[in-house]
């Protein structure tokens, strides 16, 4: 069985963003040489997310508005976590809602997606470098 590991690095210049990383995962799969197996992709930071959904800008705006209603950034004093001197209590909650990782089947050397599925990196406390792990195992 083959095993392949790669890190992607994102330095998002704004607080919140969704970035389509499907192409980068397809590149990693090609580099790995794996034809049948699994690809795990996870955010390595507790204020970022990796998730699967449709690449439609209205949906991304809906996510952003919905998450901001569930866990608004302001007032920062509303979060006990922020008593530590941080101002990102909301980002931790947003990450928890959107999830940490995805696992995608690899079939015949391709990511085995449904019709509209693509993979996204969700940033909820940007403005500094963050890593995403790609781990591929298989034959």
Task: Say what each PLM segment does.
Residues 1-139:
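Active-site histidine-anchored catalytic micro-motif
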